[in-house]
C-alpha cells in the first residue's frame, strides 16, 4: 500500500508511524506540523524526519508561521495545495491524518 500521512501537530507521532508499514510512505507536514521540517532541538532535526519516507511541507503553512522553503531540512520538499491534490490522486492509494 502507498500511504500519505498528514501531520498537523508538532508533537511526535513516531510511535503511530512505526505501526504503519506501507510499501511507500509520504509524510505531508501541514499546520504546526511544518515545524518538524524547520525546528532543531540541541542542533538535531526532528526524529520524525528519520523515517524512510518522502517528506513534504505546505508552503502556505510555512509562510503563515514566518518561514520559507529555504528554512526546510534538505529532505523536505515545499509544496502547494495543488501539489497535495496531485500526490493524493497520483502517488498514494490511501491517506491518514495524525
Give the label of every model feature segment.
Residues 1-4:
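Extreme N-terminal starter segment of soluble prokaryotic enzymes
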Residues 6-27:
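Histidine-anchored nucleotide/phosphate-binding helix
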Residues 25-31, 53-61:
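Short internal beta-strands
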Residues 33-50:
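N-terminal beta-loop-helix "entrance" segment that forms/cooperates
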Residues 38-40, 65-69:
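Glycine-rich, charge-decorated loop segments at or immediately adjacent to ligand/cofactor-binding or catalytic sites
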